[in-house]
């Protein structure tokens, strides 16, 4: 595993690079069960018919991933983000359970805004990393990757620890069109 510190869009974090050895179970078993579905984010995606920002069809991801080495670039939120996320989430749940739908709705909007900042930081680091390129993915630089990103709210141990899994299908790495 490799880790680097990042900052961007006014939000810091850590990016960890791991290799997928579980046939994507660590993300796909959570999709639409206790975590949202994935989102196509890599700059090479449109060349494969994958619209940026569209929901990931898990069957399509599995088919495209077959035979490819898979990298998981995990963006981990900084401590302050984690604390803010946890507080707003708790407040929203309390309002919901108390029957205060208006207050709960406002707090859910706040939570979406918090995640919007996280996604902005995640996109910024993906753009930077593709611009830099990783030799293990391809010798050409800069690169475009096919990436399926998955927002997770908790750690594998169930602790509040927001992070984004960015699954890179390394065999589909292409050279960026530099003008």
What is the role of each PLM region?
Residues 1-179:
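Intrinsically disordered, flexible peripheral segments
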């Amino acid at each position: 595993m490799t880790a680097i510190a990042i900052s961007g869009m006014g939000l810091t974090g850590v990016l960890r690079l791991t290799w997928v050895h579980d046939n994507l179970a660590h993300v796909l078993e959570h999709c639409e069960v206790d975590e949202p579905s994935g989102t196509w984010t890599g700059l090479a995606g449109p060349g494969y018919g994958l619209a940026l920002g569209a929901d990931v069809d898990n069957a399509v991801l599995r088919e495209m991933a077959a035979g490819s080495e898979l990298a998981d670039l995990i963006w981990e939120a900084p401590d302050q983000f984690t604390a803010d996320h946890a507080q707003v989430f708790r407040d929203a749940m309390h309002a919901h359970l108390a029957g205060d739908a208006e207050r709960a709705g406002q707090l859910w909007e706040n939570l979406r805004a918090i995640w919007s900042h996280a996604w902005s930081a995640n996109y910024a680091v993906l753009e930077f990393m593709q611009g830099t390129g990783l030799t293990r993915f391809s010798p050409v630089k800069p690169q475009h990757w096919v990436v399926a990103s998955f927002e997770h709210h908790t750690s594998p141990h169930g602790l509040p620890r927001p992070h984004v899994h960015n699954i890179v299908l390394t065999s589909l790495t292409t050279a960026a069109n530099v003008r």
